[in-house]
Amino acid sequence: MNVYILVVDDEPDVEALFRQQFRRELRAGRFQIEFASSAPDALKRAAEVRDPSLILILSDINMPGMSGLDMLPKVRAAHPDVPVIMITAYGDAETRRKAIERGAVGLLTKPIDFAMLRQEIDTRLEQAA
C-alpha cells in the first residue's frame, strides 16, 4: 500500500528538514511525505486523497490566514480516522488543551524531536498495514 504523511507549515525550510530527517525511509519507499504551505492548501490536498493512504497529518499551529487550530475541525470532519499532530514553538498547557479539544492526538514542540516522531510514524505504519 502506498501511504503518505501530510506536513503543513508555512516555513519554507520545513520541507528540506523533513526530507533530510526521513531520507532513508523515503528512499526505501516506506512512506511518502506531501507538503502544504497553508491550511487551505492542506485541506485541498487531503481532499484529493483517499483513506487509508493518508496515515498522519502534522501541522504547524501559527500560520498566516487560517491557523492550524482553525484547520483542525475541518480536517477531522473530512478524515476522522487520520490522526493529526500539531507542531508549535509554544508548548504551553493552554495551546495543548486547545489542540486536543479541536481534535489533535498530540502536540510536538519545536525544535521537533525526530526520534519521537519516527516512533509515532512507525506506529501509524503498523496500523495501516
Report residues per predicted region:
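Receiver (REC) domain active-site loop signature in two-component systems and cognate sites
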Residues: 63
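Active-site T/S-Asp motif of two-component receiver
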Residues: 58-60
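Two-component/phosphorelay signaling modules centered on CheY-like receiver
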Residues: 12-34
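A Lys-centered signature of the CheY-like receiver
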Residues: 110
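Acidic, metal-coordinating helix/loop segments flanking the phosphotransfer/catalytic sites
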Residues: 19, 35-56, 77
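Alpha4 helix (beta4-alpha4-beta5 surface) of REC/receiver domains from two-component response regulators
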Residues: 70, 77, 91-106, 119
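Receiver (REC) domain switch/active-site region of two-component response regulators
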Residues: 113
